[in-house]
Amino acid sequence: MNILLLDQYSDLGGAQQCLLDLLPALRERGWRVRAAVPGSGPLVPAMRAMGVVVDSISCGPYLLGRKSASDALRFAAGFPRFAAGIARLADGSNADLIYVNGPRLLPAAAWAARRTGRPILFHCHSRLAQRYASWLAGCSLELAGAATVACCRFAAEPLARYAGSRLRIIYNAAREPPQKRSPRGPSALLRIGVVGRIAPEKGQAEFLRAARLLAPSLPPCRFVICGDALFSDPGAERYRKLLYELAAGLPVDFLGWRTEVWPVLSQLDLLVTPSIREPAATRVILEAYACRVPVVAFPSGGIPEVVVDGKTGFLVSPSTPAALAAKIASVLARRTKLESAALAGHVLWRERFTLERYRSEMVDAVSWAARRG
């Protein structure tokens, strides 16, 4: 089978990491994969290192976040060119399936699939919160009769009425850590951290406000923020400046972006996921489970689908810095409960969120989507 794979970014966000997780399994089946992405970010050399031919594609000068009326007009003006380009790529690669890894290219890909008679699989990695965006994606799914995979029920909900029986839920996965995490001794400096893209919806500011409330009462500790802005986020520099202001006088380490998350997680006593507008079920929680790191999180988006409160992790309500500080203090005071949650999270990862399970389910979904053609 020949697969044409389309992504709207070439940075390495969660959706792109999922793609890299899947590619070896597709190639092991003997399927030929050709990809097209905009730009020349780290996704491009990563895919080429796996033997994937990568073409460049334009999908418009749109920035991360909510789209404006002018964005919609630019999209409409560029649509014929986008769609024709995808159709040419599909014909040139003799594609048996068009795999769309994000919503921005979905309308053009759906039109190209319909025109060329090819099946299409849309992988939905985050909830389309804007009504216009979910309507446009839904109409595209209907136009092409597309198969859809969503990473959680929360992400799937706006599309369910359009996709119907053509929708599957396949949760993300975490790889096996390269080595077992060494126990953190009682004399080790306490480390509490956030890992992920730097953005207001990810809650680093809430974490730092909670840290300021916590710092006077905790034993010596470090607060860790690992990550950076991605996807040409227009507000990134302003938000980064706010974070440094909030961190002033606190024992905070800003680690920047790390390609490998395991060395960071292995040094944490507690992972905090303070997302205030989480669009899916963040994969860093699954990575923490794999690494036996306990988790405290706001119950945002699809997070409650992967965290069993009080068993595999601890959910915080209301989603405020004060409540977060109180929850962190509470769980740190109960080390036995914390260790129990870390073990239960690891067991849940083994049962539901391994890379092998993800690849198996996704390969089956790709085969299912291709048979629909």
Can you say where each PLM-predicted feature lies in the sequence?
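A conserved mid-protein helix/loop that constitutes part of the nucleotide-sugar donor-binding site
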Residues: 13-21, 199-213, 286, 322
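Short His-centered aromatic/hydrophobic patch
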Residues: 100-106, 124
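Carbohydrate-associated surface elements
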Residues: 154, 173
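Nucleotide-activated donor-binding/catalytic signature segment of Leloir-type glycosyltransferases, i.e.
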Residues: 237-257
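Acidic donor-binding loop of glycosyltransferase active sites
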Residues: 266-280, 293-294
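Short hydrophobic beta-strand element within catalytic cores of glycosyltransferases
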Residues: 294-297, 307
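Conserved acidic donor-binding segment of nucleotide-sugar-dependent glycosyltransferases
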Residues: 309-310, 314-321, 330-336
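A short, well-ordered alpha-helix in the C-terminal region of glycosyltransferases
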Residues: 323, 330, 337-352, 358
